[in-house]
Amino acid sequence: MIVNIKRDKILDELLKVSRIISQKTLIPSLLGILIEVKKDKITFTTSDGDTSIKSEIMGNDLNITRIGSVLIKNKFIVEVIRKIEDEFITLEVVEGNLIKIKANNFDSVLNTLNSADYPHLSFETEGKEIIFTSTVLKEIISQTSFAIGEKEKRIVFNGLNIKTDQNNKELIITATDSFRLSCKKIDYSNNYNFDVIIPGKFINEIGRLISENDQVSELLLIIINCKQKIIEGKYPDTSKVIRTSFNTSLTINNRAIIKIIERRSVLSNETMTTIVTLKIKEQKVLVTSFTQEIGNTEEEIRDFKVEGTDQIIAFNSKYILDALKAFKTKEITIKMIDERKPLIITANDDQTLQQLVLPIRSY
């Protein structure tokens, strides 16, 4: 195997695929990156046993002299290439089990792993497919993934639910950890029906991997055919918890309410839970906060529109901030029933997104 390749390009791909490598794996070969040089491209494959990633480089960024493959620990090759400053480098397998990395006035030889021990990972699929642009996929992930549970006893809450609604020609994306819920809807014109739960870890990794210029295709196609990637189980019908009638609605500049709540939380840390209370009384709106270690703070909201009855509702500041930041609109509307029922956040300028946050009993 001999290939001459742009240093920046290979380093970028190595860093992308190496993110999922787990140092806790019991399979030694999974500590490595499988590099395969073919007739017109070079591929990089990694896996943690559950999630697998394959990336390719082709075109003018490389010149292939001899095809072949090599398995090498990711840390070694990444650190060596990171130190090289030349525009191009050459990778060459020598003596069967060594890889030589060459550049101007630089030569390094590294030990390799046995590539024959690497598990066979098939990325070929024959199932249903759905195509997202990277822009849409990144928006879906940023607006929903924060609500995915991490170590929930109900394992289905540890993933992102994606299902079709053929009646409304929509794709419904839902995440919840049982304390908050995020629901995103996008237009969907295919006749394929599916209802899958994708692990949160995989969703977040996809979000980090894709770039704005990529066309992300066949995401569900790949996952559906790799059964271990799917969380088995039936996702609950969350439409039943999203109410359509409310007693009070508060419309406000989104950035303004975010800043107010952030000021209420500025002295807290990850070990503290800041309880933020929204008080609506006689066309006056106050935001107060309380932490056991610090005490109380209060701020009055100036510009807003409120309709309905007075309310006093307390909630976790992190949960409400995550929900508000998911919206890219100028204004949002917070809809409330009472201090015990979930509040719903929507936006007139984005009918595709709803956020739900459960209140906290502050007494």
Swiss-Prot record:
SUPFAM superfamilies, sorted: DNA clamp
Record-level GO cellular component terms: cytoplasm; DNA polymerase III complex
Annotated localization: Cytoplasm
Leader peptide range in chain numbering: none
Superkingdom field: Bacteria
Keywords assigned by UniProt, alphabetized: Cytoplasm, DNA replication, DNA-binding, DNA-directed DNA polymerase, Nucleotidyltransferase, Transferase
GO BP, sorted A to Z: DNA strand elongation involved in DNA replication
Record's keyword annotation contains Transit peptide: no
InterPro entries named among the record's database cross-references: DNA_clamp_sf (IPR046938), DNA_polIII_beta (IPR001001), DNA_polIII_beta_C (IPR022635), DNA_polIII_beta_N (IPR022634)
Gene Ontology molecular function, alphabetical: 3'-5' exonuclease activity; DNA binding; DNA-directed DNA polymerase activity
A Pfam family annotated for this UniProt entry: DNA_pol3_beta
Quaternary assembly: Forms a ring-shaped head-to-tail homodimer around DNA which binds and tethers DNA polymerases and other proteins to the DNA. The DNA replisome complex has a single clamp-loading complex (3 tau and 1 each of delta, delta', psi and chi subunits) which binds 3 Pol III cores (1 core on the leading strand and 2 on the lagging strand) each with a beta sliding clamp dimer. Additional proteins in the replisome are other copies of gamma, psi and chi, Ssb, DNA helicase and RNA primase.
Function: Confers DNA tethering and processivity to DNA polymerases and other proteins. Acts as a clamp, forming a ring around DNA (a reaction catalyzed by the clamp-loading complex) which diffuses in an ATP-independent manner freely and bidirectionally along dsDNA. Initially characterized for its ability to contact the catalytic subunit of DNA polymerase III (Pol III), a complex, multichain enzyme responsible for most of the replicative synthesis in bacteria; Pol III exhibits 3'-5' exonuclease proofreading activity.
Family the entry assigns: Belongs to the beta sliding clamp family.
Name the UniProt record assigns to this protein: Beta sliding clamp
Gene that produces this protein: dnaN
